[in-house]
Amino acid sequence: NILSYSIKHRNERRMYIYPTDQAPYWGSGRFPIGKFMNQETTAMMGSVGVACKLSHSVMYLKMKRVERGRYEMTFIPICMDASKTTPEEIMRKYYDLLEEEIRETPENWLWSHNRWKW
C-alpha cells in the first residue's frame, strides 16, 4: 500500500512515480476531469490523493525524443505542495501538460490505442 509506505518513509528523501490512465481499470475509482484531446475523460485519483495528504510536490515528466532510442526528460512542476490545492486541479494541470506535449510531438503518441474505454 503506497499510502502506508509513504507515511512510514515521510522523513526520507524519496521520489514516487505514479502512472495514470485515461481509462482507469474497473474498481480503481474514476473521477471526471473534463476534456482531454476533445474527449470527456476520467482519471485515477489515488496517487494524487496521497500527494495531497502528505504535502508532496507534484511534477509532470515531459519526454523529448532526441534521436532513435534516446530521450531527454524534463520535470515540470505542477505544484510544490499538493496539500495547498485539490486533486482535481492537479490532474487538470497534468492533462493540460500532456495534451500540450502530444500536440507538440504527435509522432510520439500511440494513436491506435483506445484510451477512452468507459
Give the label of every model feature segment:
Residues I2-W118:
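Non-catalytic C-terminal accessory region of glycerolipid acyltransferases
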